[in-house]
């Protein structure tokens, strides 16, 4: 993965309390404990903006752990550290017949985050991919009723906060 690239992955739509499978690449480490993807991956959950909650079919951030020691997770990074949500419910998109249709799912939310990364990179072309990821994560809106990092990860994508100059 090039230093300016960011991998954005839909969390999945099985309604699981965790995101696993390929999503675990966000937290995969080498033998020295370094993130293989160098923090350049985001896992995206489906926020239902109409009902102001994570969509019931969206996989959640969860508590998947690769390394347990004495019953305690000792992973340096967890999926919830790379999990962000964006609206993916009732999104109008193109249909296979050439028209338009309304769809919902994490595959509708992931392009929103991809677009956000593109806008941020356009604003600050000097930033590396891992820094763009961190910007999205640290500016995530956690002002969510019943916020739980194991469900909501780092919160809801907040482009207003992400596009503000640091310190403003």
Where are these regions (language model features)?
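Extracellular S/T/G-rich loop segment that most often corresponds to the catalytic His/Ser-adjacent loop
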Residues: 28-122, 126
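A short helix->loop->beta-strand "cap" motif at the edges of active sites that frequently abuts
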Residues: 2-6, 39
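P-loop NTPase catalytic cores that bind/hydrolyze ATP
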Residues: 1, 111, 118, 138-139
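Metal-dependent catalytic neighborhoods of phosphoester/phosphodiester hydrolases
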Residues: 19-25
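Active-site environment of divalent metal-dependent phosphoester hydrolases
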Residues: 13-19
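Active-site neighborhood of phospho(di)ester-bond hydrolases with catalytic His/Asp-centered motifs
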Residues: 8-12, 44
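C-terminal subdomain of the subtilisin-like protease fold in secreted/lumenal serine endopeptidases
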Residues: 40-43, 122-168
């Amino acid at each position: 993965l090039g230093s300016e690239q960011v991998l954005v992955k839909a969390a999945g739509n099985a309604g699981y309390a965790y995101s696993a499978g390929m999503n675990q690449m966000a937290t995969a480490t080498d033998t020295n404990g370094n993130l293989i993807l160098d923090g350049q991956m985001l896992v995206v959950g489906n926020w239902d903006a109409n009902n102001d909650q994570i969509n019931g079919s969206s996989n959640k951030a969860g508590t998947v752990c690769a390394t347990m020691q004495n019953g305690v997770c000792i992973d340096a990074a967890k999926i919830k550290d790379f999990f962000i949500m964006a609206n993916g419910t009732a999104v109008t998109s193109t249909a296979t017949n050439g028209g338009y249709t309304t769809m919902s799912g994490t595959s509708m939310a992931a392009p929103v985050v991809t677009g956000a990364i593109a806008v941020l990179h356009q604003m600050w072309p000097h930033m590396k991919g891992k820094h763009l990821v961190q910007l999205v994560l640290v500016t995530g809106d956690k002002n969510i009723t019943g916020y739980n990092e194991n469900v909501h990860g780092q919160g809801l994508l907040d482009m207003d906060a992400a596009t503000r100059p640091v310190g403003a």
